[in-house]
From Swiss-Prot:
It comes from Cryptococcus neoformans var. neoformans serotype D (strain JEC21 / ATCC MYA-565) (Filobasidiella neoformans). Residues 156-176 have a biased composition (Low complexity). GO terms for biological process: DNA repair; DNA repair-dependent chromatin remodeling; positive regulation of heterochromatin formation; regulation of transcription by RNA polymerase II. It is an enzyme of class 2 (transferase). This is Histone acetyltransferase ESA1. GO terms for molecular function: chromatin binding; histone acetyltransferase activity; histone H3K4 acetyltransferase activity; peptide 2-hydroxyisobutyryltransferase activity; peptide butyryltransferase activity; peptide crotonyltransferase activity; transcription coregulator activity; zinc ion binding.
Length: 564
């Protein structure tokens, strides 16, 4: 590759000989900063906490002009260095083999142009070779021009046929569009395997109503290359390698059928956020949140209004959770806001920790704002606005100024699968203090009062799985050590409210299942006992059931008829 004529994604493969494969890696110094486009992988300078810096390989996900400074931002100091012209364009990078939480916007001056750069792999040509289209004998007369574009009538037939095929849930007979939402729920619940199909907006709306994501959720787990959400394929994502419908020359005369590229773009810009994990939601739109006295860096995309996108800091009232673009507006709001605790019933108070029960139907605005905040830290959360079917249990810590939110978990009012947690989160400024375990323990205390076995909504994310495994292990091992007689799996489940599947999962993960005298037994190894002793030796908070003042809420059929 000649330094005088750098390769660009548009110019690759357009050499003197047609069909010549373009190099996938550009050597250092053979390209310029203008050649860095979304999709390439390049080395980026990453500052470290110790004051040093290292070069990390990163993928460019998006670019944008450098945002203008906010009118509320403080002026730069007089001795500040002059801005680098390369920083006029910012690049959103994902560090390869690092967690998605570390994705960030960087200026052009942090790109290492002296090292090699990898071009994005071409996807169109290999797929055309791997999936040749079946030739169909055409009954229409051939045209003199020899153009491959079919007539409008044939195009309409082909487009409508492709759209009907895309709406089928199984290879059998076609399913009406009104039943697609129901079929998607059955497929996700595991009743029968579901084939790939293109999702319509009706599907995504039905999926949003039934999917409140776990804090821990994996999909998901759900893990992509860095432990986060991947594209939905078996659940109904659009496979761009299959059935492409060409657009006619006269769009006005065409039926309301889109090509794959148009459909993906439509979903990306106006469709349900459930389908856009790999598009818009890959790019974080907020940098920091100011919640009370804590300034927190966001981890993931959250669908706040576009007017607030890419602000340096979004200011949030820690009591009513309303959001403002400047500290001045927040101060004006705080002078009028009278809320000092979550707007619900306090059902637990002990040692400064309180739990409030909030009905999503009665406090829609507050719960929606809570979901928007939690989406900044939960990559797999897909439900933001339909909060009516859920109860929210918010944990707070009390001081002289009020009850400050620490974390929460949501719970379906009526769960067919028996889940006792739909989404769970401890705010980052309060993590690693044992509050996550308190949330998990409190959810099981509610299940004990209900007299039911409970389990978090599956699948769990990496952090959620670690937290639940630690809780399950502690409770199961503690019960086995305190028992002076043989105890069955059913007795463990009834005393802890942990489901049989979660008990078996924990025992298998700890290698506690042994085969002895023609039966399976639970055997506590020395390593498990030693780890349990170390855990119990640490001082930690615990839920005291005597301070729980709560009865399971009962809802009428009319109260559970959400959206009808």
């Amino acid at each position: 590759m000649s330094p005088s004529a750098p390769s660009t994604p548009h110019g690759r493969g357009s050499g003197s000989e047609p069909g010549t494969p373009a190099p996938s890696v550009a050597a250092g110094g053979s390209y310029t900063i203008d050649d860095v486009v979304p999709g390439v992988k390049i080395y980026v300078i990453k500052p470290l906490s110790n004051g040093q810096a290292e070069q990390r390989r990163a993928e460019i996900l998006s670019t944008r002009p450098k945002p203008k400074p906010s009118a509320f931002a403080p002026p730069p100091p007089p001795n500040a260095p002059s801005p680098d012209p390369r920083d006029d364009t910012e690049y959103y990078v994902h560090y390869v083999e690092f967690n998605k939480r570390l994705d960030e916007w960087v200026g052009g001056s942090r790109l290492v142009l002296s090292k090699e750069m990898e071009w994005p792999k071409s996807k169109d040509e290999p797929k055309k070779k791997d999936r040749p289209a079946k030739a169909q004998p055409s009954k229409a007369p051939s045209r003199a021009t020899g153009s491959p574009i079919p007539s409008d009538s044939l195009l309409k037939k082909a487009a409508n046929k492709a759209a009907m095929a895309a709406g089928k849930a199984t290879p059998g007979k076609a399913m009406p569009s009104s039943k697609l939402g129901k079929a998607s729920k059955i497929g996700k619940a595991g009743k029968f395997p579901q084939k790939r199909k293109a999702k319509t907006e009706a599907d995504t709306e039905a999926e949003e109503e039934s999917n409140e994501d776990n804090d821990a959720l994996g999909e998901e787990e759900d893990m992509d290359e860095d432990g986060d959400v991947t594209l939905i394929t078996s659940d109904g994502a659009i496979d761009p390698s299959r059935e492409v419908v060409a657009a006619p020359s006269n769009p006005r005369a065409a039926p309301q059928v889109f090509s794959k590229k148009q459909e993906i773009e439509k979903l990306r810009t106006s469709g349900s956020m459930t389908q856009s994990h790999s598009e818009i939601s890959r790019v974080k739109n907020l940098n920091k949140l100011q919640i009370g006295k804590h300034e927190v860096e966001t981890w993931y995309f959250s669908p706040y209004p576009i007017e607030y996108a890419h602000l340096p800091v979004l200011y949030i009232c820690e009591f009513c959770l309303l959001y403002y673009p400047s500290a001045t507006q927040l101060r004006r709001h705080r002078a009028k806001c009278t809320l000092l605790h979550p707007p619900g019933n306090e059902i637990y108070r002990h040692e400064g920790i309180s739990f409030f029960e909030i009905d999503g139907r009665k406090q829609r605005t507050w719960c929606r704002n809570l979901c928007l905040i939690s989406k900044c830290f939960l990559d797999h959360k897909t439900l933001y606005y339909d909060v009516d079917p859920f109860l929210y249990y918010c944990m707070t810590v009390k001081d002289d100024y009020g009850c400050h939110l620490i974390g929460y978990f949501s719970k379906e009012k009526e769960s067919a699968e028996g889940y006792n947690v739909a989404c769970i989160l401890t705010l980052p400024q309060h993590q690693r203090k044992g509050y996550g375990r308190l949330l998990i323990e409190f959810s099981y205390e509610l299940s004990k009062v209900e007299g039911k076995l409970g389990s978090p909504e599956k699948p769990l994310s990496d952090l959620g799985l670690l937290g639940y495994r630690a809780y399950w292990q502690e409770k199961i091992v503690e019960l086995l050590l305190d028992s002076d007689y043989e105890i069955s799996l059913d007795e463990i489940a009834q005393k802890t409210s942990i489901t049989h599947g979660d008990i078996m999962h924990t025992c298998q993960a700890l290698q506690m299942i042994k085969y002895y005298k023609n039966s399976h037994i639970i055997h506590l190894t020395d390593a498990v006992i030693e780890q349990h002793k170390k855990t119990k030796a640490k001082p930690r908070r615990a839920i005291n059931p005597a301070y729980l003042k709560w009865k399971p809420p009962v809802f009428s059929r009319a109260q559970l008829a959400f959206g009808f």
